[in-house]
């Protein structure tokens, strides 16, 4: 077959997936080390634009990547951590918001427009999208999410724009709170009853015995996932992601995928091919 015929065959095979996801909501969490490489970022954003073009309601939720740490260092704010959570005073919370909603969010919106799409950037503060309360006095302005109000996302989804959400939160006291971006994204996915929640990271997915490639898990249900957690076969860094996914699936999320965002066009390979690319988690 010629290259053109191969391309046509691939598109034909993808048709059933285009139809499956058309008019469905797919929430994508983008953050961490995946944000560092500009080529990786462009590949992810191009995939997102294609998803939008074929009629999928794509919602992009992001963390701060290295931007928060860089801004805190610039203003000589030392980071302290308690049980993996950054201790956040009021100034740190304001700087984190600047990095998230200012630098990172608007950069993503700009890049999507540059690539030929459209995007509207908001933070969890806008429209009280993400509400939170303080976890403890020791952590300062670190929040536990108490409610999601997705109306602003639903309105954006009625347009040709991709909603790009910075994972900051607002309290009933009017204060800004730092919340876990994975948790924020999963809660948004649950509130929208999304068909799919894709959590991009810098690992392939779940393993029964990490990093043994022979133990890679293509698909798993919640019951067997619980067994892996109890058997301590899930690495510590994955536990918060798993807990976030479990909560969202209880709230109405259809499926979740842990996916290596560094793989070129990983989103397309996951959604539009039979084999997929990462670990699919279902009910």
UniProtKB/Swiss-Prot annotation:
Pathway: Amino-acid biosynthesis; L-arginine biosynthesis; N(2)-acetyl-L-ornithine from L-glutamate: step 2/4. The record marks 29, 241 as: Transition state stabilizer. GO terms for cellular component: cytoplasm. InterPro entries: AceGlu_kinase-like_sf (IPR036393), AcgluKinase_fam (IPR004662), ArgB (IPR037528), Asp/Glu/Uridylate_kinase (IPR001048), Glu/AcGlu_kinase (IPR001057), NAGK-C (IPR041727). It holds the Pfam family AA_kinase. One of its GO terms (biological process) is arginine biosynthetic process via ornithine. Catalyzes the ATP-dependent phosphorylation of N-acetyl-L-glutamate. This is Acetylglutamate kinase. It comes from Lactococcus lactis subsp. cremoris (strain SK11).
């Amino acid at each position: 077959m010629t290259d053109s015929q191969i391309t046509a065959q691939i598109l034909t095979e993808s048709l059933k997936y285009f139809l499956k996801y058309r008019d469905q909501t797919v929430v994508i969490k983008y953050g961490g080390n995946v944000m560092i490489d500009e080529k990786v970022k462009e590949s992810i954003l191009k995939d997102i634009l294609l998803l939008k073009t074929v009629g999928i309601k794509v919602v992009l939720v992001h963390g701060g990547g290295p931007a928060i740490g860089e801004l805190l260092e610039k203003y000589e704010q030392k980071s302290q951590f308690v049980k993996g959570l950054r201790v956040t005073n009021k100034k740190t919370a304001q700087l984190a918001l600047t990095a998230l909603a200012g630098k990172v969010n608007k950069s993503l919106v700009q890049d999507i427009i540059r690539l030929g799409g459209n995007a509207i950037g908001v933070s969890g503060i806008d429209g009280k999208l993400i509400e939170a309360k303080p976890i403890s006095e020791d952590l300062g302005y670190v929040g536990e999410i108490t409610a999601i109000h997705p109306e602003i996302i639903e309105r954006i989804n009625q347009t040709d724009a991709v909603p790009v959400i910075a994972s900051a939160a607002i309290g009933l006291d009017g204060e800004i709170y730092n919340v876990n971006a994975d948790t924020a994204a999963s809660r948004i996915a649950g509130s929208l009853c999304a068909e799919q929640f894709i959590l991009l990271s810098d690992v392939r997915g779940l393993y029964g015995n990490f990093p043994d490639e022979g133990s890679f898990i293509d698909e798993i249900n919640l019951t067997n996932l619980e067994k892996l957690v109890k058997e301590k076969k899930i690495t510590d860094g994955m536990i918060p992601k798993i807990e976030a996914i479990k909560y969202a699936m209880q709230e109405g999320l259809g499926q979740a995928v842990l996916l290596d965002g560094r793989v070129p066009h990983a989103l397309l390979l996951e959604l539009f091919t039979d084999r997929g690319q990462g670990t699919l988690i279902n009910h």
